[in-house]
Curated annotation (Swiss-Prot):
Domain (POLO box): residue spans on this chain: 500-578, 598-682
One MF annotation (Gene Ontology) recorded for this entry: GTPase binding
GO cellular component, one term: nucleus
Catalytic activity: L-seryl-[protein] + ATP = O-phospho-L-seryl-[protein] + ADP + H(+); L-threonyl-[protein] + ATP = O-phospho-L-threonyl-[protein] + ADP + H(+)
Residues that bind ATP: L85, G86, K87, G88, G89, F90, A91, K92, C93, K108
EC number: 2.7.11.21
The Protein kinase domain, residue ranges: 79-331
Name of the protein in question: Serine/threonine-protein kinase PLK2
Length: 682
C-alpha cells in the first residue's frame, strides 16, 4: 500500500467550511470547490507506463464526502480536516489539525470501502505495524492511528515544503552541494531502516518529504517489508517501475542492495532532471534495467559519475554499502552545506563564500588537498600569477617537505632539565590530572629534542624541525581561522592507515622519553638527543645520532658504544608491552613503502603531551579525558584523527573540517594543540 504515494498540492482547500465557530482553528476556506488535479509525481503500484505521470481516476475513491470535523472514537479528540496534500492507491492525504492544541499533522485517510478485501486490509495493518515503531530524524514520524465507521486515519509528521518531486519539478535539476545535502539525510534515514531490518522498496523523489526547516524525511512505507534471508525473499515486483532493480525484475527478491539501486536512480535524477532508465515503452525500460544500460552525460563530474555507476551496478554485490556511499569522494571532495534556505525549493542557491580570507583558503584547500600536481594548473586562466596564487603555491610547496631534520637543541641547565619525579603514563595517562578547561596559556613542564642538525646547508635551510612544525602549524591555523561554526563533528569517516603513538612512558628524569607506534615499533628519544628504534620484529635497531644519519644493527649484536642504550630501549619495550594498554581503536597497519617514523620533539604541558615526528605526523594527548588529536599527511593531503574519551577514533580530511566546521570540544583541542606547537620553543 502506498503512504503519501503522490503529493498533489491544492492551493485552496476544496470542501465545505467547518462550523462557523471552528472556522479559525481549522484554517478552512470558503472558496468554491475546485476539480481535483491529477497526481504530479509518484505512480501507483499498478502503473504500467514509466515515462508518463499516472492519473488516478477513482472518482468514487473516497466514497461519501469526508466530514470536516473528525472525532477519534477512543479518545474523543476532535480534529479539523484541511486541504488535500496528496493521494495514492487507497488513500488521500490531508492536512489535519488537532483542535485541542492546534498541532498540524499529515493525515492519511483510507475509506473502509477501499480496503474491504482481507488482503487489502492486511496491507494497511502491515504498514501501520512497520511504521509505528520507527523513530529517526530523517524518517517521517508516525504519531497515531484510529478508525471510525467510514475511514481509517493515520496521523503522520506534517512536512510543509512537500516532497523532493515538487522541488525538482520547479528546479529541473539540482546543484552538487544540494544533492550531497539531501543524499546525506536519505542515507542517514535509510541506514536506520536497514539497521531495523526494514527494506523501503519504493525509494523515489515523491517519497522524500521536506519540512519547514528544509530537513528531509523518508516516508511512505506502503511497500516496505522486513528483510528476509535470501532463500525466503518475496519474488513479487513492486515499487515504481523506473526504480526497480535488475534482481527484482528477474524475480530474485529484494534486499538492501535493491534500495541502493533506487538511491542511484534518485541521485541521477536529482543531478540530471530525468531518471536513468526512462524510455518510451515499458518493455524497453525493463531491458535497459536488466542490462544496467543508461547514458552518463559528460556534464557530470567524475566523482558523481563514479558513485552513480557503483550504485547502478548490475550485480547487487558490486553496489556500495551506505557507509561506502558517505565515504565516497563525491562527499569527501565537495562542499556540503549545513543547511539550505527555503528559496532552494524554486531557485538555484548561491554558495559563494564572500570573505576574501575564505576564498583564499578555499583555493588553498584545492591546491593543498586536491592532488594538483603543478603550478601550471593555476596559470591556465591568468597570464600573470596573482599574489594569492603564489601564496597558495608556496604553502603547498612547504607541505611537500616531509624529510625533516631539526634545529640544534638548546643547552639547558640542570634545573631546567629536572622534570617531576618519574612518571609512567598509561596510554597517555599522566600523573598530572587536570580538570580545568583547555585554555590558551601553555604551561610547559618538560621537553626533549633530537640531536644537532647535520652540516648540510640545504638541510638547515629546507628541512629543519622548524619547517615541519611551521608547516603543520600553518595548515592547522588556516583550518581553525576559516572553518565555519558547527555544533557537531562531520559525518565523514575515512578508513585509512597511518602510524600513531599508542603508548608512551616519560622517564626523562633518568633516561628519556619512550613510545610505541601502532605498528609495534618502539622508540626512545634519549636525554642526550639521540634516538633509537626497535623495529616490530624485535631484532633490528635503527639509531639516529643526528637527523638523516641512520645506523642499523641487530639488537643482539649492537656496537659496544650502544649496548647500554639498547638495554634501556628493550626495558622500555618490555615495560610498555606488559603494563600499558592501547590508547585507541585505530587498526595497526604497516605500510612498508612509507618512511620509518621517529620522534623529533616531545613536549609536556600541565594539560597535554605533544609529539612531532620526522614525516610531519603530529599527535597531542590530553591527560584529563584521554582524548587525542593526530594530524598526518597522506598523498599531499592532511588528515586529522580525533580519538574521544571512549577511545573511539574518527578520521577526516582537514578540508572537510574547513568546509563543515566541527564541534567545540574538537575545536578547543585543535586550538590548544596549535598553541603547543607555536610555543614549543618557549
Amino acid at each position: 500500500m502506498e503512504l503519501l504515494r503522490t503529493i498533489t498540492y491544492q492551493p485552496a482547500a476544496g470542501t465545505k467550511m467547518c462550523e462557523q465557530a471552528l472556522g479559525k482553528a481549522c484554517g478552512g476556506d470558503s472558496k468554491k470547490k475546485r476539480p481535483q488535479q491529477p497526481s504530479e509525481d509518484g505512480q501507483s503500484q499498478a502503473q504500467v507506463t514509466p515515462a508518463a505521470p499516472h492519473h488516478h481516476h477513482h472518482h468514487s475513491h473516497s466514497g461519501p464526502e469526508i466530514s470536516r470535523i473528525i472525532v477519534d472514537p477512543t479518545t474523543g479528540k476532535r480534529y479539523c480536516r484541511g486541504k488535500v496534500l496528496g493521494k495514492g492507491g487507497f488513500a488521500k492525504c490531508y492536512e489535519m489539525t488537532d483542535l485541542t492544541n492546534n498541532k498540524v499533522y499529515a493525515a492519511k485517510i483510507i475509506p473502509h470501502s477501499r480496503v474491504a478485501k482481507p488482503h487489502q486490509r492486511e496491507k494497511i495493518d502491515k504498514e501501520i505495524e512497520l511504521h509505528r515503531i520507527l523513530h529517526h530524524k530523517h524518517v517521517v514520524q508516525f504519531y497515531h492511528y484510529f478508525e471510525d465507521k467510514e475511514n481509517i486515519y493515520i496521523l503522520l509528521e506534517y512536512c510543509s515544503r512537500r516532497s523532493m518531486a515538487h522541488i525538482l519539478k520547479a528546479r529541473k535539476v539540482l546543484t552538487e552541494p544540494e544533492v550531497r545535502y539531501y543524499l546525506r539525510q536519505i542515507v542517514s534515514g535509510l541506514k536506520y531502516l536497514h539497521e531495523q531490518e526494514i527494506l523501503h522498496r519504493d525509494l523515489k523523489l515523491g517519497n522524500f518529504f521536506i519540512n519547514e526547516a528544509m530537513e528531509l524525511k523518508v516516508g511512505d512505507f506502503g511497500l516496505a517489508a522486513r528483510l528476509e534471508p535470501l532463500e525466503h525473499r518475496r519474488r513479487t515486483i513492486c515499487g515504481t517501475p523506473n526504480y526497480l532493480s535488475p534482481e527484482v525484475l528477474n524475480k530474485q527478491g529484494h534486499g538492501c542492495e535493491s534500495d541502493i539501486w533506487a538511491l542511484g536512480c534518485v541521485m541521477y535524477t536529482m543531478l540530471l532532471g530525468r531518471p536513468p532508465f526512462e524510455t518510451t515503452n515499458l518493455k524497453e525500460t525493463y531491458r535497459c534495467i536488466r542490462e544496467a544500460r543508461y547514458t552518463m552525460p559528460s556534464s557530470l563530474l567524475a566523482p558523481a559519475k563514479h558513485l552513480i555507476a557503483s550504485m547502478l551496478s548490475k550485480n547487487p554485490e558490486d553496489r556500495p554499502s551506505l557507509d561506502d556511499i558517505i565515504r565516497h569522494d563525491f562527499f569527501l571532495q565537495g562542499f556540503t552545506p549545513d543547511r539550505l534556505s527555503s528559496s532552494c525549493c524554486h531557485t538555484v542557491p548561491d554558495f559563494h563564500l564572500s570573505s576574501p580570507a575564505k576564498n583564499f583558503f578555499k583555493k588553498a584547500a584545492a591546491a593543498l588537498f586536491g592532488g594538483k600536481k603543478d603550478k601550471a594548473r593555476y596559470n591556465d586562466t591568468h597570464n600573470k600569477v596573482s599574489k594569492e596564487d603564489e601564496d597558495i603555491y608556496k604553502l603547498r610547496h612547504d607541505l611537500k617537505k616531509t624529510s625533516i631534520t631539526q634545529q640544534p637543541s638548546k643547552h639547558r641547565t640542570d634545573e631546567e632539565l629536572q622534570p617531576p619525579p618519574t612518571t609512567f603514563a598509561k596510554s597517555g595517562t599522566s600523573a598530572v590530572e587536570n580538570k580545568q578547561q583547555i585554555g590558551d596559556a601553555i604551561r610547559m613542564i618538560v621537553r626533549g629534542t633530537l640531536g644537532s642538525c647535520s652540516s648540510s646547508s640545504e638541510c638547515l635551510e629546507d628541512s629543519t624541525m622548524g619547517s615541519v612544525a611551521d608547516t603543520v602549524a600553518r595548515v592547522l591555523r588556516g583550518c581553525l581561522e576559516n572553518m565555519p561554526e558547527a555544533d557537531c563533528i562531520p559525518k565523514e569517516q575515512l578508513s585509512t592507515s597511518f602510524q600513531w603513538v599508542t603508548k608512551w612512558v616519560d622517564y626523562s628524569n633518568k633516561y628519556g622519553f619512550g613510545y610505541q607506534l601502532s605498528d609495534h615499533t618502539v622508540g626512545v628519544l634519549f636525554n642526550n638527543g639521540a634516538h633509537m628504534s626497535l623495529l616490530p620484529d624485535k631484532k633490528t635497531v635503527h639509531y639516529y645520532a643526528e637527523l638523516g644519519q641512520c645506523s642499523v644493527f641487530p639488537a643482539t649484536d649492537a656496537p659496544e658504544q650502544f649496548i647500554s642504550q639498547v638495554t634501556v630501549l628493550k626495558y622500555f619495550s618490555h615495560y610498555m608491552e606488559e603494563n600499558l594498554m592501547d590508547g585507541g581503536d585505530l587498526p595497526s597497519v604497516t605500510d612498508i613503502r612509507r618512511p620509518r617514523l621517529y620522534l623529533l620533539q616531545w613536549l609536556k604541558s600541565d594539560k597535554a603531551l605533544m609529539m612531532l615526528f620526522n614525516d610531519g605526523t603530529f599527535q597531542v594527548n590530553f591527560y584529563h579525558d584521554h582524548t587525542k588529536i593526530i594530524i598526518c599527511n597522506q598523498n599531499e593531503e592532511y588528515l586529522l584523527t580525533y580519538i574521544n574519551e571512549d577511545r573511539i577514533s574518527t578520521t577526516f580530511r582537514l578540508t572537510t573540517l574547513l568546509m563543515s566546521g566541527c564541534s567545540l570540544e574538537l575545536k578547543h583541542r585543535m586550538e590548544y594543540a596549535l598553541n603547543m606547537l607555536l610555543q614549543r620553543c618557549n
